[in-house]
Amino acid sequence: AEILRSVQESMAAWRQRRSSHRTKRAESSICYNGIGCFQTSGPYGYIDILPSPPEEIATRFLLYSSRRSRGDTPLMDVPFTNLSAVFDWAGQAYNVSAPTKIIVHGFGSSCSYVWAYEMRSALMSVEDCNVICVDWEGGATLPNYVRAAANARLVGKQLAMLIQGLQKLGLSLQNIHMIGFSLGAHVAGFAGAELKNLSRITGLDPAGPLFESQDPRARLDSSDAHFVDVIHSNGENLILGGLGSSQPMGHVDFYPNGGRMQKGCSHLFVGAVTDIFLSVSEVEGRSLCNHRRAYKFFTDSVSPQCQFPAVRCDSFDKYAAGACFPCPDGELCSNMGYYADKVKGRGVQYLVTRDEEPFCAHQYLVRVDSTPSVLPVVSYGKIQLTLISNDDLNETFVLTMKDDEELKVGASLSKIIVPHPALQSFTALE
């Protein structure tokens, strides 16, 4: 799937269309039976496209239960056009007292993708819950990203209607946690704005193009639920391959590895320069690696053994330099991912992850101080640190930026390291 190329070309065509209209276009609206009316005015006027007809979007709700589902087969796979069937079934078999997790995919995706299965399985493995996957593949199909962005509003309204129906059967909004990836994060936001008192929304690298810096009513925002947590993994400029947003949108916003590019994924700027030498699949894979890390981080975090501790700081550069270590109290620290609502830390939070799975681990600030000298001695080389556990496991970290780093006498060197989880109880250093 050529997702990045589709987004870039669709956005270019949208900008060209807007620039060709020197005068304001007439506002338009459309009403869909049983759903409501949509306009190209107000906070949504900038997109200038109305949502597609519901029959084209073909939204489906796939319902699972940790008690009743078997394998990958949903208990129900219901199109929005037959929503009453959900309520008939739910009245008999839906556990309204159990937490309900709702997964919403983004552009060029569907509920049949592996990541949705892995997230669903992880959620049902840690608690007795219901899981609903919102499949709007027909409205999120390539190549028209702008059309998909417009459709997100309608899908959000459809999702809100599903929840309102389940409320009548006893489901509490305080038991609902929506998890949206990319465009799906904004779908969740639109649904939350409609419902008013939703408990929680987790935005996984919310889509940036057409949403960043827009009116809070036209994107995911902290007002859409009592608790909104966001993981930013690809908040780079679209020209450089960025598909996510860097704008804070929640009560707590996590920026792993700075939030622009992720460890283990190729550098976006270098990639942009070399795009002309690479195949579409190579360019696509490099960019999407950063974007998709958001849902990988979240899925990993569902396991209680996989923690992503984060610290509030003014910038990632300050964080990486150790300026915000240690966390003086629990008010400034948080835990990225599934358990973010269990800790007090809010605001902009930074952390460093591993570059391969497991991505989660504790972070340690290492500082090397050299003894001062009356003589201005300078040497060149690299400094390595090896951690050794009591069962002889070890891992080595290079603390200098390069092999011939300038090492001045009396200077200090600081770096944050993230050891493998098996080395969390190391007993020796070399």
Task: Give the role of each language-model region.
Residues 105, 179-190:
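Glycine-rich nucleophile elbow surrounding the catalytic serine of serine-hydrolase chemistry
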Residues 151-152, 197:
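Non-catalytic cap/lid and distal C-terminal segments of serine-dependent acyl enzymes
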Residues 1-133, 140-143, 147, 151, ...:
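Flexible, membrane-associating and regulatory peripheral segments of lipid-active enzymes
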Residues 205-262:
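The feature captures the conserved acid-bearing segment of alpha/beta-hydrolase catalytic domains
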Residues 170-182, 201:
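Alpha/beta-hydrolase fold nucleophile elbow
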Residues 155, 182-183, 206:
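Active-site loop->helix "elbow" adjoining a glycine-rich segment at hydrolase catalytic centers
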Residues 120, 191-195, 216-224:
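Mature extracellular/periplasmic domains of secretome proteins
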